[in-house]
Amino acid sequence: MPKERTLTGDGVSLLVREWPGGAPGILLVHGLASSSHIWDLVAPRLSRAGTRTVAYDQRGHGRSGKPSSGYGFGRTGADAAAVIAATRLGRPVAVGHSWGANVVLELAVRSRRRVSGLVLVDGGFLRLRDRFDWPTAEQVLAPPNLSGTPLHEFLEMIQYFLRGQVEITPEVEAVFLSLMRVDAQGNIHPRLSRANHLRILRALWEQDALELLRRVRLPTLILAVRSKPGTADSAGFMEEKERAAGAVRTIGDPVRFEWIEGIHDLPLQRPAALAGRIRRFAAAIEH
C-alpha cells in the first residue's frame, strides 16, 4: 500500500501517494475528471521494479482541495513542481495521462530543471481549438450531469462503457468510486465540480500543445492510443490523432512519437505494458 499525506501550499491541499523505490523517481499525473487512483495498477509495478513513484490528486479532484480558481496550466504545473519538491523526488520522469500530459508538458517548458523527461500518455499533443471553437467545445465536451445518480446505476454505466475492454475487478471499481462522493441515500456526486471542469477545459482549449512540444528540451515520449473503430473513446479523435502525429513527427529530437493499441483509459486496460514502456524510457535517459 502506498503512503499517503497531504501537502498544503498556495491555498490548496494536495493528496499525495508514495510507493517506495529508488532513482530515477517517477511522478504520475492523472487526467481531467480522474484521480491518482487511475495509476493504482501501474504504480505498484513501477515500485516492484525498484522505482520510487509518486502520484497525487490534482486540485479540484479526488481528496485534494477544490478552490474555484487556479486551473490554468501555470498553476497546475506549479502544483506538480510543489509535489516534486515536497517529496524530494529529485528530477523525476513526469508521466501524464490525458490532461495530466498537458500539465507536465507545460511544467517542462516553464521549469525544465524540475524533471528529467516526459511520458505523455494519450495527451499533450492535440490542439482542441483545431477541432472546435470555444462555444462548441464547451457544449460537446461538458461533463454529463451525474449528480444524484444511484451508485448501482453508475457502476452499471461503467460496466457498459468498458465492456470487452477492461475487466471490472474490485481494484478497477475502486478507481471509479474515487471520482465520486456517495451520499447517505446511496447517490453519487462527482468530486470535480462542473464549474471547475469547464475551467480546466477552457485552459486545454487555449493551450497550444504542438508549440510547447517544439520548445521542450527534454527527452519526451508520446504514447498515443490507437483505438479500434467503434470503441466508445475513438469517437472521431482517431482522425485528429493521425493528423497530430504527422505534425509531431516533424519536430524530431528530443520528442518521440509511438502508437500503443488500447483505449484512452490505458492505465486500467494495459497497466503492465504501460509500466514497461515507462521503465524502459526512464532507464534509457538515466544512462
Segments from the language model and where they lie:
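Alpha/beta-hydrolase fold catalytic core
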Residues: 1-26, 48-51, 89-90, 245-247, ...
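Conserved alpha/beta-hydrolase catalytic His-Asp/Glu region
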Residues: 130-131, 149-203
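Conserved HGGG/HGGXW glycine-rich cap/lid loop of the alpha/beta-hydrolase fold
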Residues: 15-63
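Active-site loop/oxyanion-hole signature of alpha/beta-hydrolase fold enzymes
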Residues: 7-10, 43, 48, 54, ...
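Hydrolases whose catalytic domains are alpha/beta-hydrolase-1, hotdog thioesterase
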Residues: 103-107
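Catalytic histidine-centered segment of alpha/beta-hydrolase-like enzymes
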Residues: 262-271
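Flexible "cap/lid" loop of the alpha/beta hydrolase fold
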Residues: 109, 116-150
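Conserved loop-alpha-helix segment in the C-terminal half of the alpha/beta-hydrolase fold
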Residues: 217-261
